[in-house]
Amino acid sequence: MGFSEFFASALGTVARAKATLQGGFARFLSETVVTLQAASPEMRKFAYSKLWEEVDSVKELKPLTAQELVATLRKELWCAQVRAQKCTLASTSRFCTCGGIPGEATPTVIKETVHVDECPNGRNLCRHGTRCLRHGGPGSFQQEREVQVDAPKCPHCAGTGIVPASASWREIRRCWREQRKVHSLPSLPLHPDVLFEGTNAWQTRLRWLKTWRHVLGDVKPCTPEKWMQAAQIMRTCAVPSFENPIPGQFGYERLYNGEGKEEYWLQIPATDKYTDLIINWWHAKNTPGWEEPSSSLMDFKRNRMGPCLHIVEKRVRNSYVAPPWKPWGEDIDILSVMDSLSSQLEDFLDVFYDCAAQFDGELEFSLSNDRLSSVTGELGGVPISIGAPSKISNTPPKVNFAELYGNLVRHNHRKISALRPILMAHPDQDEIEDQLDHLENKQGGEIVSTPSFIKMLKEKRKEVRGKEFEEGSEGRLVRSKDLELSKKDIFLAHTLMDKFHGMSIVKKFGKSDPKLTKVCVDLTNQEEVIKYPVKELQTTSEGVLSAQTFTVLNRPQFKELNRLAEVGWKEAKSVCLNLHIRSYLPVHLPVYAFCVIMWGHSSNAEQASLSGAYVYLGDQEASVLQLPLLCGYIGNALEDMEAYKRSLVLSTCFFGTSGLSPGQNMFGITAVEFTEYLPTSYGGITHERDSWNQMLRNHQGVDKQRFISGFNVVDFVEAGKEKQLHFPDFDLQPVPKHQPIVRTFGKEKQPLLNKSRSMRVKTFTSFRAGNIPIGRQIDNTAEAINFELGRASTSNAINPRLDTSETNLRAGGEFAFIHTIDLPTAVTEGQVLAKIDIFKKIQDAKSMVCVQWMQAGYVNKNLTFISHLAPSQFCGVAIWYIFDAYGKIPSDVTTSLELEIARSLCPHVHVLRDSKTSVWTIDFHKICGQSLNFSGRGFSKPTLWVIAASTAQLPWSAQVTYRLEALAQGDEIAHGLATRSIVTYPISLEHLKDIEIMLPPRQMAIGNAGSINFPLSFAVQQKSSSGRIAYSYAAGLLSHFLGIGGTIHFKIQCTSSAFVTARLRVALWGDTITLEQLSQMPHVDCDVDVVSSLKIQSPFYATANFGDSGARFWVTPMSSPMAPETMESKLEYYIQILGIDADPPMCRQINYDQRFAWFTLLRPPDPKLSKILKLTLPSRVCNIAYKEATVTNYVNAFAIMCATTGMHAGKCILHFSWTLNKGTSFKDLQGHISFYSGMGDSTIGEHHGEFHLGGPLSSSLAVPFEFGSFAGPVTSGGTPFTSENWLRVETAHWDWLTSLTVDIQVLPGFRFYGRSAGPLTIPS
């Protein structure tokens, strides 16, 4: 039987349990390698089956206990005791043979006197036994009690396991360690002269030292830092014992008195010998406890203990070393066979621990041989029952395998298994002592070892706890059991895994196994009080419904999380939350509370609502079971502790009797959180219960006090209420995003959300003893074990009572301005309807938000635009709203704008047949790259263009006038440059996930059933009919790649009249396809305004960004466009690319070193031209112009990126290269070309930087440069600031040269801000 067959059999299941219970099976396999190396070829086929037979027949099915370990050590590992050290002094400590294990405790019977309390006056409580003194008894009696007396400690090691060295050797070692102490150099402030001599003149001083080597001898030079400290001491202090050995101007006189003269300290030799004399003198004077080093103990030999190794360990290691066996003529090595055996064992252990964590049952053993007879229990909720191996399968064939390798292997294996804990308790002492020596040398004192420190803390804790509970009160608050949840209710308890932990079988996996978890019960909010809010939503005949109030549920503190993260825990999973409620209202007052645990990081109430409960506050005390089921990363929690705290928020609204005043204390809460910590994201063995039926039985009933009702909870019990109220319908709002989240009592706060969704919560009348179904849940009629943990109920499901609705965006913002737009009756494609200067409109409106922005100095919120143009499904018109942040649209555009140019600016499309497209938001940090400032326009010129994107298929009967409204909405944005949506060099694939590409609008004739295809050439330039050239922001990013592969996210929007309809199917393919192929390949049947995704399919697995090679969009009408008889208009649609999830191997960059050509100056062959060249380069990438030369400005990925973004800044290297004129003679080449940088006005040259000279024959030069200004980034083009950097190129022999070329090598970290397009002009 091989391993594959064996693992699949029932015998393998039992054998796996036995192998793991015994432990150390991997060591057993490694020892059997020795035997199998010498085995005959006939035995190899029986190796696998006999190993398992040995496990099944010989290995004992009980773990090794401490008593057996001590008995084995005393019986087989004992050796001669260490004699007293009288004559021969021990130079090092030694391991004691007792192993540091205390002896067995001896049971001893002792007698103690027990006093009998006297009976109270007037009563006789003495019945049987000893009577008290009041009733004539002795008042006490003797009682025998058996106690365990500890065995005496070992006389040689005092129970530590290590016999210390002799006292005299320890004293010598202490003195030797004192001599080896390393003292740091003095840190005196250095005089500028000393600093100069120790740095700039150091090489001269070393050469001077070699000159006087015949006087100083062959000595080692010291470091400059050491010499400078010695020179500073000599300069400021009097050193009477130093004598200069080098004859100089002053002979052999002493250098002292500290007068600051250079001749006294300049002549100090730069050697360790003479600098140590000065530094040791300084230490003797200023360092307490300093002793001058002596060479008396330099030859002291430090002996070490070495590793802990016993005789049995040596015998096993040395007895079975044999060369690998390999039969003649065969290439199979038996070691490879055993390696595969070990690897299969590791796979088996992974599977076994997964099964063991879910096993809840009993293992029965036979009384005759203590072997496993049967297994009965549940595995993952499924009942299992396994009989004895003899009853399941036949016994494997018998082979005398035991005689092959003898009894010695098994005998020694048992002893080594017993010895292993002792060896682990005594690690290699060499490394430990080296660390102690190192720390003592650095600290200069004794170190408290970790075991002794822990022992001291334990003794202190016992002392404190003994005093604390010595006179404790006997009174105790007894709570109802159903009001408390324990670990046993939520997590698995008393399972097979807990038994393994108790027997220390899996103890070694406690830190290394990624599948283990840590279960904690954390007390969060303890003294929190929920108050009645100010605002009331509605009043009914039965009561008043209040507004929501939010309470942050405190999580574990920063120190606790930091401690858990340091020991290796990565994730914290909040499984359950037990919310204890103490009502502050009179008993049976008809007031109810709807408590919802919400996730504080979502603006959608439906997604944020984790669980809700309906609580009756007429009872004094209640508990609510909540199920957050929320997992968080501890690392991010440590980085943003505030975000971690607000992850769980309690939302409460009240309904009941009227008359409650705002600020009234309603109830107090104490939240207990059941958390499970995981070391990795691997999955692991969770301890959550698969079924909570047992908990429901314990916490439900007529006489119970727990009240649970709501959604996402296990069940609901309604009892003890005198009257059933009808809780009214209301809109549950998400947690507002203002920082920090506090109680909303006392002031109504407006949610600062760009877009939020509320959740409609309806009456609870029909939900007695059942969950409240909501839209995102499925049928909860089955058992809880069949569904997600804790999200199902055993109650019958009924009709849903929750629906969702969009919040009104117009009521949530602050008015900024409004603009009136006229729409002609017969609007044409590209017609400019309006041009709105946003700054001017905001200032002219003089709204309240404008005043706030004037006070703040900048626009601190994004603008949400609402087009009030009434929807019309039959006109077939689409309006483009183009936000031109940097004034890229040319000034000559007045009445019409070509769509090829307009779509490069990523317009927002308002389709009149779709009312959802009438609202959109402009993100200033994303599009502008900065926040708009009211103190001036700066770089940005925010303008909103309104353009008709299509011709009206059905004209209006009259001109339409509508309003465009702007609201300030959302979170407050940071002042200054953007902190997100920044593109940084080198361009990465992450930047492609958020690009907006508006493909050209396309038309399909009525009745046309043919497919339309066009290539995915996203990086090519767009050229209009008038000759204007345009590149989009996406083209700038994609220009850095020759091609891309991955998944494209897009959507299709139909702009034609509702009279014209069709059904389209879209696919990505690289060749012509048929209808049958289209139906079988990946495709999307597109609906209007629905985001779809397709993977790029082409013969090259990628598509080219330039040209038409690669994949193509194939649009096939599954139903050809159709319209009424009198309607002859075409179907108009457009495709918008939202982003690309690129596949890294499929994306090829165009330039690995990020070097791009900027421009070239070509001198015309005209002798009348000036011979002087003066060219000034600004600190911004732009088109260069020079009157006396022909300039070629190159187009490349870097130039397109600078033109299609708002601003850029960063460091680079400018590479200059030039060519000589053919008519120039070498004898005339006597000039140079100068390159120098500066700042400020370049005509004045007030501030100069670097200066480089290049000869005509050198032909190239590289100069570092940085693009930017005092404001940080700069725009492409425009008028340079006076305070910008510049680089000037000058030569008086321009006639020698033919051309001058400049390349830009972009360095990592170069940044781009904002999104735009360019150049939008007609080439000259």
Swiss-Prot record:
Keywords: Capsid protein, Host cell junction, Host cytoplasm, Host nucleus, Transport, Viral movement protein, Virion
GO CC entries: host cell cytoplasm; host cell nucleus; host cell plasmodesma; viral capsid
Gene3D superfamilies per record: 2.60.120.20
Domain of life from the UniProt record: Viruses
Compartments reported by the entry: Host cell junction, Host plasmodesma
Modifications made to the protein after synthesis: Specific enzymatic cleavages in vivo by the P1 encoded 3C-like protease yield mature proteins. The N-terminus of the coat protein is blocked.
Keyword Transport included in the entry's annotation: yes
Pfam families linked to this entry: Nepo_coat, Nepo_coat_C, Nepo_coat_N
GO terms classed as biological process: transport of virus in host, cell to cell
Molecular function per GO: structural molecule activity
Keyword Transport in annotation: yes
Main localization of the protein described in the UniProt heading: host cell
Homology family: Belongs to the nepoviruses RNA2 polyprotein family.
Other known facts: Virions are comprised of 60 copies of the coat protein.
Descriptive protein name: RNA2 polyprotein
Originating organism: Grapevine chrome mosaic virus
